[in-house]
């Protein structure tokens, strides 16, 4: 069975590659807006929207839709549109607790089964000096993604501790993906 990742995100695709899950990326290009104010419902609604849109682009297989946001002081921190917004997100995160929420939606086009859930990871941040914020923005070419935090590079130095899924912070909680796959009575070996 073919797996389609409803995203052109190189980060998400690399995660699937790292855990040896064959897949094909499809560009769903949906407007990331939700009517939900609850962050958990928000990410699940957008993940479902992406998966459903992806389902209109192929005729069979599995469609995986994902949406990740950072929640800080009870507010959703969206992907920054400018480098200044990315800097501001880092300033707010300094010496703070943040939650990374990912909505995950899996559709089996062969059986018409669909499951949607979310994963939450709590992150405690170290102090981030203005000099280090500028250094990070200068070095990190992908700073305009995932609320400005690219944990695999310099931003990893800013993290004091993580409670929950590391892969969730990267945008694809493989543990939750596996759980949804098992709900469909499928195994990793079923994906080709």
Language model features with spans:
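GST superfamily/GST-like fold recognition
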Residues: 1-15, 120-192
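Short beta-strand-to-turn element immediately C-terminal to the catalytic PLP-Schiff-base lysine
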Residues: 71, 107, 159-161
